[in-house]
Amino acid sequence: MESPTQTSEHIESMTEFLVKHYPDQLREISLSSDPKLHYPLFIEYAELVDDNPSLARQVFSDPEHYLRQFDDSAILAHKIALEHMKKFEEKIGIEKRFIHVRINTSGSPLERSPETFPSIGRVRVKHRGILMMLKGTVIRSGAVKMYEGEKMYRCRKCKHMFPIFPELESINSIVKPPFCPSQRSKACEGTNFDPVDDTVTRHDYQEIKIQENTQVLGVGVIPRSILVVLKDDLVDNVKAGDDVVVSGILTSKWSHDLKDVRCDLEPMLIANHVRRTNELKSEIDISDDLIEKFKNFWSHFRDTPLKGRNAILRGICPQVFGLFTVKLAVALTLIGGVQHVDASGTKVRGESHLLLIGDPGTGKSQFLKFAAKLSNRAVITTGLGSTSAGLTVTAVKDGGEWMLEAGALVLADGGLCCIDEFDSMREHDRATIHEAMEQQSISVAKAGLVTTLSTKTIVFGATNPKGQYDPDQSLSVNTALSGPLLSRFDIVLVLLDTKNPEWDAVVSSHILAEVQIEQDREVDDLTTIWPLPMLQRYIQFVKKNFRPVLSKEAEEIISSYYRLQRRSSTHNAARTTVRMLESLIRLAQAHARLMFRNEVTRLDAITAILCIESSMTISAIVDSMGNALHSNFSEEPDQECILFRH
């Protein structure tokens, strides 16, 4: 146990550190109007390491003790800031009772060590009691509760007053010390203590559960989860589906006493700092050199932009030969359009959705898996193993109360949700994703919990046709999917295995030559095939930096095509709705982004129309679009485009 002198020295050095490095935050807290609130004071662990390495080491090795001292130091630093404001700024702040130091460990040595930043599945007893970090996705968010925090007690013998803190391990129970903790010249031997009236501090309290990110796990590895406790200012800062990095102290929680059931200790992380990483996804690993590389690539293809575009598209699922239309559709779906708010205040989604309908062996699942690799956040599921609750949210009972656990669409918020074998889902399960696809949210009313969760998700589905595909019938008949669901997909591509001997010969030659091509390929040559990491960063970059605007010419082309489709005697009622017009705009914007532009040109509008035409079983402007399965890359696409215009 520390002596009073050591404690005062630590608090003094902590106070000095806070006043020196964080005067602006202290000033903001002082000017805040509510004295009853709990205020966070964010500090950087890397700064603490540079300024006072020994103190940083002590905070790491015994965070429970030293973080309490840091909170006391924050109150002292706040009082110094109040005095400074009164003296030099002639402003009177309001004294606050509750300030909590929140240590951001990102960018510090703790982030680079597997001992202090393990995956959730590798958390062990050795991590107990140190400051550590965990990364995961919030899958469950409990209700905000209140608990009694520290409480003052008085020794009957020497009248010494001291605080007792509740033990979260034993369900917030208060355990009195065996003897008086007064540290005077002569030790007190008192063992009886009385609570002091009106000295209880109450805190907000919330339990969440975070799960390992499935994308970093190997095949067949079950993602592990851990309980995280949020207190005071941290409560209600995250919701189900958020990606978070949590810094805190690992401890354990006793299970409830049940007859004939063995008591277990459940690992639990008491959070000190929570950082949402959803917004940071698009900024990862895009260096200035890489941006310059992208610009040089498009400078090289200034006169032949479509050839440059095709070089990018060849990098999508390179093991599958041809299928140009599908690869273009995958790229446009992942890039997406620009979300905007119309005159009535309604949000019009920017995310596109894609459905692949095809015979077995046409590469549908390959595209799904590759798209999941390209996306910064992806959830893959199959229709047979998915229920409405598994796709949206599940109401689960934990400790006598209900809470919501996130499903696939909520976990994929801000990313991609791939649903293979779409036709295997039951009809009422498919109906639950209607709202998620169009309104980008899920409204829930389960077990007395009524809420709305965000699902800004790209839905990528793959399905087999119902029996033999009949070109004379509508998509609804061939796939057994309802019209409202089909209209929500921007692109619906049909891949039919027509057993064409010429095509089979070309494909077999490609597969046999694949090994030799792979050996001869240069890694840095972007003019042939782009590697997966480069594609990921390119898609992230264009989504973040380009917000294309429609030119007058593009508007006229899209509007004329939409009117032509509506007038066509052969149009599909399920597809030719206002949603088709919105899909055309999104796809044209996505193509402009793919072409590294901020304006939607005539070429982008025509490409969007050709994608929609490929989705139509009966075309309104072209006699036959051909089979998407047999669409190959053109050697001279720019010359073909000029001929097409004339």
Curated annotation (Swiss-Prot):
Q: Where is the motif Arginine finger annotated in this sequence?
A: 487-490
- List residues binding ATP: G358, D359, P360, G361, T362, G363, K364, S365
GO terms in the biological process aspect are: DNA repair; meiotic cell cycle
What InterPro entries does this protein map onto?
Answer: AAA+_ATPase (IPR003593), MCM (IPR031327), MCM_dom (IPR001208), MCM_lid (IPR041562), MCM_OB (IPR033762), NA-bd_OB-fold (IPR012340), P-loop_NTPase (IPR027417)
Q: Where in the cell is it found?
A: Nucleus
Q: What GO terms fall under cellular component here?
A: nucleus
Asked if Metal-binding is a keyword of the record, the answer is yes
Record Gene3D superfamilies: 2.20.28.10, mini-chromosome maintenance (MCM) complex, chain A, domain 1, Nucleic acid-binding proteins, P-loop containing nucleotide triphosphate hydrolases
Q: What is its EC number?
A: 3.6.4.12
Zinc fingers (C4-type), as residue ranges, are 155-188
Per UniProt, the keywords (alphabetical) are: ATP-binding, DNA damage, DNA repair, DNA-binding, Helicase, Hydrolase, Meiosis, Metal-binding, Nucleotide-binding, Nucleus, Zinc, Zinc-finger
Subcellular location, principal: nucleus
Q: Name one GO molecular function term.
A: ATP binding
Q: Which SMART domains match?
A: AAA, MCM
Ranges of residues in domain MCM: 308-511
The UniProt catalytic activity note for this protein reads: ATP + H2O = ADP + phosphate + H(+)
Highest rank taxon of the organism: Eukaryota
Q: Family, per the entry?
A: Belongs to the MCM family.
Job description of the protein: Probable DNA helicase that may play a role in DNA repair during meiosis.
From the Swiss-Prot or TrEMBL record, give the protein name: Probable DNA helicase MCM9
- Protein's organism: Arabidopsis thaliana (Mouse-ear cress)
